[in-house]
Amino acid sequence: MSGAGAAGSVRGLRVDGLPPLPKSLSGLLHSASGGGASGGWRHLERLYAQKSRIQDELSRGSAGGGGARAAALPAKPPNLDAALALLRKEMVGLRQLDMSLLCQLYSLYESIQEYKGACQAAASPDSTYALENGFFDEEDEYFQEQNSLQDGKERGPPRDLMLPVSPLPSGDWILESI
């Protein structure tokens, strides 16, 4: 395979039985895994917006070419090249949908983590500042957990020990999900 080297350069994106990513999408994923760690979910949202534009262009192209598909199965392509082109177009659409769902899932994951932090802050009696200004910082959560652990040592064995949640870097989370 000629595209195997390009897909092999991005760790974890090659799955047995599936062809490598098209160059356009592998570039997006490579930039998300390499440079997305600083931007977090906002970077993924930008990728999602770019994916949506590409998907809209593809849908406009297919609508202009023959209208919406009325039948469940499209007409058989006249030759092998046309069949491969149709398959490529479908694969691009599926990969874009996959990226869209992945971005939404990651955004949901971060929202859940923020909500868990806010709930922990609300349960803690000495964290009124985090709730008053509406912001909750991961550093605040870390220091609150450290203080509660030190207080717990003074009081005796804890009744309800909660493990700290360590969020995955965005690039690692994406690669593990794929």
From Swiss-Prot:
Belongs to the FAM89 family. PANTHER family: LEUCINE REPEAT ADAPTER PROTEIN 25, PROTEIN FAM89A. This is Protein FAM89A. It comes from Bos taurus. The lineage of its organism: Eukaryota, Metazoa, Chordata, Craniata, Vertebrata.
